[in-house]
From Swiss-Prot:
HAMAP family: Acetate_kinase (MF_00020). Its cofactor is Mg(2+); Mn(2+). This is Acetate kinase. The gene is ackA. Mg(2+). Can also accept Mn(2+). Transmembrane segments: none annotated. Pathway: Metabolic intermediate biosynthesis; acetyl-CoA biosynthesis; acetyl-CoA from acetate: step 1/2. It comes from the Bacteria. It catalyses: acetate + ATP = acetyl phosphate + ADP.
Amino acid sequence: MKILIINTGSSSLKFAIYQYENSKKLISGVIEKIKEQKSIIKIINTDGSITERFEKGIENHPKAIEKMFKILLNSNSKILKNISEIKIIGHRVVHGGSYFKNSVILKNSNLDKLKQSSKLAPLHNPSAIAAIETVLKILPHAKQVLCFDTSWHQTIKKHAFLYATPYSWYKEHNIRKYGFHGLSYSYVTKRSSEILNKKIDNLNLIILHLGNGASINAVKDGKSYDTSMGITPLEGLVMGTRSGDIDPSIINLMSTILNKNTKQIEEILNKESGILGISEKSNDMRDIWNKIEEGEYQSKLAVEIMTYRVKKYIGSYIAILDFNVDAIVFTGGIGVVDYEVRELALKGFEKIGIELDLEKNKMAQNKNLESEISTIKSKVKILAIPTNEESTILEDIYNLIPKNL
């Protein structure tokens, strides 16, 4: 019996097959550039080998789901003899709104509530819903489990999640901070507890999930206490293509200046801003560092703006945790690999006893390795931990659907 895990992005579809009885990963893959002229399909086998090919553009997520099942059935690894071997499907869903405080087994009522939440995540939830409905048609008798990035942050208190807007906006329209990257933060919190040999209930962390999308999470007593992303993933840190925090008046101002509607301006803030917007070169940090080596000013400025924002958030989260922090933890593609970003983000904190070991930090560039990168005398541990959202989804699946099914 097999478990299929699906992670839909706005233009991508990640998937993995696990053996139900022992949680062993059998195969994984990703379909990228959905809705574009050429799509990319990558298959990652258990031996680490990768096969990659280009195909004529896959037009939408339902077609991508159909393609995924064909790939799994036709794989040289013979993982599946029959599609009916898949009995459970776990979905990563970005936004659960106010409805979902935990992962749930799919029911019609849950799907209706998820559709209602889509207005809060128009860039992310529609693709997840399309995947869920397509799987429902192909495997109608399989159990589907919905795992939400927002659920982890349901422990944030009202004074931290409310915006200072009319209270009726919250009561009538659920306008509030929700936060994201929750599956990642849940995993990293558990791993930090194991590494530090400290019970989760007594654990205070500042976790930075730094990738093309980026956020920061204050964890108090093992639970989410505050986070930088808001009602959507646009708020907070400077990201690959997202602006992060801005004065909201800019939206109407630039709408008038550029003669664009507010939806178009929001699209620019989501897809043409951040590192890409400032550098006018790339949203890929590898490209940015290359441009900096060439002496390119705007790329250097983009990194300065990004790491300055990160440093501000770290400082404020140290304060709200009452200066009682067990570890600062970096995760995500940039957080685990980019030692220069870590160094810039933590520069100056040695004055309050948070000391980065520069040599250890420089050595920690492997996306698959956990590292402790603080000095021996640092009052706060500094860690780099690769995230594993699939592990959190698997754990939630087994909690909802026991192994003696």
